[in-house]
Amino acid sequence: MLIIGLCVVSMLLLSSNTFYLSGGVLGGSLVVNWFYPVLGKFGSILIGFVLALIGFIFCSGTSLIRLIVTFYHWLTMKNEQSENAEQEKSTEELEQIVIVKSDRSETENLDQNYLNVEQNSEIETVKPSLEAENISIGKSSSHLINISGLNPEVSIKSEYELANEENEKPQFSFGFDSESLPSVNLSSDSDEQRVSKNDFVAVWNKPVKTVVQEDLAIKSKCG
């Protein structure tokens, strides 16, 4: 069938001369006697292609089909491998990110632990020094003079405060003894005695003794 199809196609498409036919004896006889009078030129060409294709499939089509199938599988496998490789790369990147984050967290935890240890060591070193200072202060305070029997209201001043008070005092102090001034009391209106006409008596009508006594009384009131 492959040979028949090729002979028919070559007879219709290629040119021939008086010495030989392009499709050979088989192609020429089939075209002139069978295909061309019934189907015409276009139908004869179509029949020739169909016969050639069928003959090719029967001759070597199985191997060709297998080759095509294997090529298709190779393409799909290649695509699958590329997809798998991309997925593996993405998973590796994610694992690297997670590992890096975990390493950073571990380093941060180690740094924090180291800082806490340093702070604790500093506190432990400061505690004995403070205790030693407190002991020394207690010993020095035991040597101070303790005065008992004082009233609780009395406060003992330190030498520093006494020195400051002495410095604040003026160097030259002048004392003046001032006499007490007399006090004047003003009587209110209610304390005043009302004077009437009968209280006024002519001086010449009174004796001298009574006049002097009245003057002394007035002076004592004003004083």
UniProtKB/Swiss-Prot annotation:
Membrane topology: Multi-pass membrane protein
Keyword annotations: Cell membrane, Membrane, Transmembrane, Transmembrane helix
Localization per record: Cell membrane
GO cellular component terms attached to this protein's record: plasma membrane
Transmembrane region(s): 1-21, 45-65
Keyword Transmembrane helix part of the UniProt annotation: yes
This protein's name: Uncharacterized protein HI_1594
Species per Swiss-Prot/TrEMBL record: Haemophilus influenzae (strain ATCC 51907 / DSM 11121 / KW20 / Rd)
Lineage: Bacteria, Pseudomonadati, Pseudomonadota, Gammaproteobacteria, Pasteurellales
